[in-house]
Amino acid sequence: MFNQQRYKQSREAASRASRILFSLGFILLLSASDASAQALDVKIKVVPGTPQRVRVEGRRAESATAWSIRNFYGSAAGLAERVENFQLFGEDGAAVVVKKLAPGEFSAAGPAARFSYDFKLDPPAFVSDSSHVSWLTADRGLLMLADLLPVPLTNAKVELSIPAGWKVATAEARNASGVFEVADAERAVFAVGRDLKERRARAGAMSFTLVTAGDWAFTEEEAADSAAEILKIHQETTGGAPRQSPHVVMLPLPQAGAAGNLWSAETRGATVVLVSGRLPSKLAAKAQLDGALTHELFHLWVPNGLALEGEYDWFYEGFTNYVALRAGMRRGQLTFHDYLNALGSAYDSYRRARGPREVSLPEASQRRFAGSGALVYHKGLLVAFLYDLTLMRQTGGKNSLVEVYRELFRRHGRGEQPADGNRAVVAALGSAGGMRAFVERYVEGSTELTLPSLIEPLGLRVEPGGARTHVGVSDSLDSAQRELLRKLGYNERPDAESRKLHERLRKRSSQ
């Protein structure tokens, strides 16, 4: 259920490092000169053919001589290499000579306000990039303004032209003239295609729109019901609904012959994108959908609902893995035994990924796309688990990680003054129930996670024997431990199977 494709790890990071530094340096140079973020008026036209492409024409609010189009997004590289026929014009429409300095980096001979170019939008080579970048097929696609328009971006007015018979679905507002008025172009996503279907539904206090295309083993109603249940649970966790009614977009993977168990997901602003392979079994397909949505829908709140900045991926990805695990248990997707198995699996993955020395969670986030992606997800999940249970134990079950999330939204909900994400989250975690020392050691610090000793006070243990880590319940529990585990779904009778497994493993290890 926790598909390994979910982990957005880097590829070819070392060979790209110098190019990344060049691109970042050039963008910083632009922001310090005459390319400050400003409004755009643009027209994007989907042009059928091979390869699939869009034509982009537009105008900046103010003229500039330095122009840039994003070339990297996370682990996706070479995005600006898809740009062709890049041209610039003055306010009077006269052409301005332009020089290409590097992929996506252009210098104009004089001030230019108008621009035009073609963008090839073949599907990305890697399945894991399919939810993160713009692409088109003959039937459908994703258009993401963050990689289509000149950067840096603020707001934009977007006129979208699509082939006859196609539809567009987006969370962005459309005015009476049919033009989309985009308040934050970095977060804007447009799904386009000839077979798009929209279904509006409610989840507790909020409404949402499910956008689907293609054929799936489950029905649209079943997908909408899953999304509604998960959204309702996440509302209860955070204490409120997102500020904007979300769109949940489900599209088939655009790569021909992609395996059915592969998928990629991302949340930008109020849009959740899930691009997935198609499994023939309804049971397997529904389990894959539920697993993906349980994690990804929480991103509508964290980080997208918080006014926090910086690289605190360890929290909004790693801790979200734990929140998804608990939500899956509440829905009945996962049992208490599944919960323990997931922790054992995460511990094994953490030990494989930690390398020759331990690093703090903030440091792992800084290096996420340079080899530390697994630490962000697996160590983040483990620290969230240990934090949650330790806080519950110290407060007699009165406080948990849920209270930390609610406090974050009280202090730093979107609309508040932007703050540094690492500082804000560390402060919130450390202020709860005597958890300051825990946070200093396992979040800010680089203390190794030794699971057997850390879970013993919680009434859990690592089972002996076997190549993989198995977490089980201790033979003897005190009343506080028993009550703590019951809050997580532990039931002594069903857990008899786990005790039998422990006994078999103990005997095997002693032979």
Regions found by a protein language model. Give the residues of each.
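Juxtacatalytic substrate-recognition/specificity segment
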Residues: 197-312
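Zn2+-dependent metallopeptidase catalytic core
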Residues: 78-85, 89, 153-169, 181, ...
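Extended, low-hydrophobicity, Ser/Thr/Pro/Gly-biased non-transmembrane segments
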Residues: 70-73, 117-197
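Bacterial N-terminal signal peptides
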Residues: 21-31
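Beta/coil-rich, acidic/histidine-enriched accessory regions frequently appended to metallopeptidases
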Residues: 38-46, 52-53, 59, 82, ...
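N-terminal secretory signal peptides that target proteins for export/translocation
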Residues: 1-16
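A surface-exposed beta-strand-loop module
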Residues: 46-47, 75-132
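Acidic/His/Gly-enriched intrinsically disordered linker/tail segments
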Residues: 308-382, 394-395, 406, 410-415
